[in-house]
Swiss-Prot record:
It comes from Acetivibrio thermocellus (strain ATCC 27405 / DSM 1237 / JCM 9322 / NBRC 103400 / NCIMB 10682 / NRRL B-4536 / VPI 7372). Keywords: Cytoplasm, Ribosome biogenesis. Belongs to the RimP family. One of its GO terms (cellular component) is cytosol. Required for maturation of 30S ribosomal subunits. GO terms for biological process: ribosomal small subunit assembly; translation. The keyword Iron-sulfur does not apply. This is Ribosome maturation factor RimP. The lineage of its organism: Bacteria, Bacillati, Bacillota, Clostridia, Eubacteriales. Its main location: cytoplasm.
Length: 154
């Protein structure tokens, strides 16, 4: 079974648990670091996720994973907040963070650059739209974008 298939199965398992608590399932990652595998589930809610929220979701998902056993080897389960600089992946993410400063990384350089920063204007017709330097609009086709994340200035 591939990583992507495992992530899809776990997403199907996690969604009802997360929704039951009125949280948002932000992402599921199944990755190998060193010799260990990690199943990371990122959740969020308006106002932010607490450690208690993570614990409740972790325990419920862990029970289901133990029963259904979809992953053929050992792994560590981690449930956490996606963090302030979370990647924006879903259309709802682009709507939620409209007006905020974002960083867009593309796979192939555009005019010699791979990283662009600007105000998130929106997402339309499978394109991410940002405003650079106050008023210059840039559009990025979703399949040409490696990563979009919020830029947090302190």
């Amino acid at each position: 079974m591939t990583r992507k298939e495992i992530e899809e199965i776990v997403t199907e398992i996690a969604n009802p648990v997360v929704n039951k608590h009125s949280f948002e399932l932000v992402d599921v990652e199944f990755i190998k670091e060193g010799s260990s595998w990690y199943l990371r589930i990122y959740i969020d809610k308006p106002g932010g996720i607490t450690i208690d929220d993570c614990q409740v979701v972790s325990e419920e998902i862990s029970d289901i994973l133990d029963k259904e056993d979809p992953i053929p080897h050992s792994y560590f389960l981690e449930v956490s907040s996606p963090g302030l600089d979370r990647p924006l992946k879903k259309e709802s993410d682009f709507e939620r963070f409209k007006g905020e400063l974002v960083e867009v990384k593309v796979f192939k350089p555009i005019e010699g650059k791979k990283i662009f920063e600007g105000e998130l204007v929106g997402y339309k017709d499978n394109k991410i739209i940002i405003k650079k330097n106050g008023n210059e609009l840039m559009e990025f086709e979703r399949d040409k974008v490696a990563l979009v994340r919020r830029v947090i200035k302190f």
